[in-house]
């Protein structure tokens, strides 16, 4: 440590030039401090004297200084106002200039940039869409969707109330809602349009119908027209069907009995392509060809044709047809309802009713499935499942609905609403009352039918509106119903309200025992045929589309017409 102190003293005692300096002694430092204190004391005394003199002068001139002070303040205020006005004017000019620039950018500059960017994006998409590997991606770029708040009516969500219990009301009476109809028609006087099929998906709808150019009899040639569109609101705030794209299939292909499904941005239809009449088809082994058509919103279409050997049938069939009414889409599959004649009948007891009927047994019901007019074939309903429907070659599998779960096989439709699948089948046999229920598509297939006593259909004399006793007959007409409540007890439909004739089309809202609210389309003599009803909600408010084949009597042809009603659901207040 002593060595280090010696080095430091040596450093500070040496100047940069190398010469040595003498360190000031303690006495010399003390003398300098006393001198500075004396100087500071004198300065303080001088400042005190100066302050006293200034105060005396101010007091002497006080009378004059107050007036000068006021004038000074006023001058300062005026100067401040001038500065304020100058600043305000300057700021206003700057703001106006900047606002003009912003307005110019918004009205001109930004739109120009947006248009340029839009063109760039469109060009990029077009270039991408020219590549085959991106075709599926590009097909999804067309933005078509139902109006906001519109969705297929789901009974579980619809049939409820904030307070109280829901019910169908008879007052006020339902009425037709105004709006246009753009269903496909005929360009010839004698043209006949038949078999309307409507599927309403989450984003779009699909509609299909068959056109025969001369009369309604099958002449071996017919057009099939498939439309895709969306549901919008018209100026009266009522829903409308708005077609976006339409495709007409070759008249020589003679598609028949087509069922449709709308899912995603595509429409699918499954049709039969018969080369013989129906009775001849049932009398021979094997089925006529089936065809699956695909149509997208860009108008692109694709068709897959299947021969008997290419369809996975669980039993040999002599005839098989899609059921006209719409099908459903599930994960990876399309499911259509179908019907046809088995080459060899199945064993088992079918749905039956013997109470109140004379000389009727279970055997009577079993034999009633075998239709003499169709070569004695046992007519059953089937599930037609199209697997991998997005692939290059979808596969078709047919599963027969057990005869223990069903009545006579017939036309019909499927609806997937919420977590339930609803089934409707035409009352073509002895059971004339409405046939609607819940289908369990797991194995084995089961149907929980909802008994309806109020709704029926016209039929021949032996199987008319009121018939409930088993016997062999093939009659009736396709008049499907849409479930409004989860148990399908409350429904919307269009019935031909007559005993034996296809007349008097009437829109009906009904429960299992009573017709609650109804509207006759015209009069009891108006001739009609097939009807189909599909319902939607718009932010919870229910509406139904009714498509009815109306007989243009002066022309003696059929033409589907579109009608719309508001669902008369109310809430019963709790007492």
UniProtKB/Swiss-Prot annotation:
Record keyword Transmembrane present: yes
A GO molecular-function annotation: host cell surface receptor binding
Sugar attachment sites: 77, 499, 511
Positions in coiled-coil regions: none
GO biological-process terms attached to the record: symbiont entry into host cell; virion attachment to host cell
CC terms in the record's Gene Ontology section: host cell plasma membrane; membrane; viral envelope; virion membrane
Top-level EC class: hydrolase
Protein's UniProt name: Hemagglutinin-neuraminidase
Organism expressing this protein natively: Sendai virus (strain Fushimi) (SeV)
Gene: HN
